[in-house]
A protein has these predicted regions:
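Conserved, structured core segments of small domains
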Residues: 1-100
Length: 100
């Protein structure tokens, strides 16, 4: 299962991280343990795509966002383009059950 994780750390955490090489190291190690498939960072936000086999694994991977980044991440299901045809077919089957 893939998930898109969006987070927005408080400004004081961002400022602290810019000033502290030790905090930068800790955050870098936490991101490595998370093993994101992809990551993007902007001035205000961060985005990760993570692949997990269970929800408890998702919780473990996202723990750094709660504790280090002091943020409440937004978590959305994600899928690759190779999975899109099956997803659309399944949605069509389910829609027909309800007369659409």
């Amino acid at each position: 299962m893939k998930f898109l994780v969006e987070f927005n750390p408080p400004i004081d955490m961002k400022n602290d991280m810019e000033k502290s090489p030790e905090l930068q190291k800790i955050v870098g190690e936490a991101i490595e343990r998370m093993k994101p498939l992809a990551a993007w960072f902007t001035l205000r936000y961060g985005f990760f795509v993570v692949d997990v086999n269970s929800y408890d694994e998702l919780t473990r991977k996202l723990a750094p966002l709660f504790h280090l980044f002091k943020s409440d991440p937004k978590i959305s299901p994600a899928f690759g383009l190779d999975e899109f045809p099956k997803l659309v077919a399944t949605l069509g089957e389910e829609a027909r059950k309800y007369g659409y």
